């Protein structure tokens, strides 16, 4: 947990939050752009950090197309920078989750978090678009913003 605490402290200094730290159970949440609340939970048994966010809910009228889109996005993590998309049973909440092993905490925490937030922006827009489609239309198959962006690259939008 020491690596996680140090990585979070370094990130906090960069963001102007010098006292940023997890609680005694390893939990911390961060809000970006006053709308995206990202949860971080250290798992001592696995010596890893899990990052997760609830993106949206699946509209019941568009379940099939949204589920298909999410499954395709998980295919070799092509559209999510190494994170995983899932749907919470019972309420159709869509989550994006990423595991960070201890070794990545010491040298790539900030970059991993940046890539995660890029995937959050991308998938939030895709889900919103899919939930608001007229029946019988497909989600826009236009240019894929994530195409060509590897897990080690970034394209923060200003």
Tell where the protein language model's regions lie, with residue ranges.
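A short acidic-to-branched-hydrophobic micro-motif
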Residues: 39-42, 46-57
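Short, highly charged C-terminal tails/helix-capping segments
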Residues: 128-158
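A generic beta-sheet turn/junction motif
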Residues: 33, 44-46, 89
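Well-ordered alpha/beta subsegment
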Residues: 83-114, 121-140
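Charge-rich, low-complexity N-terminal segments
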Residues: 1-38
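Hydrophobic residues embedded in beta-strands of well-ordered beta-sheets
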Residues: 28, 47-49, 92-94
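Conserved short hydrophobic interaction patches
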Residues: 11-14, 69-77, 112-126
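Short, internal acidic amphipathic alpha-helical interface segments
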Residues: 54-90
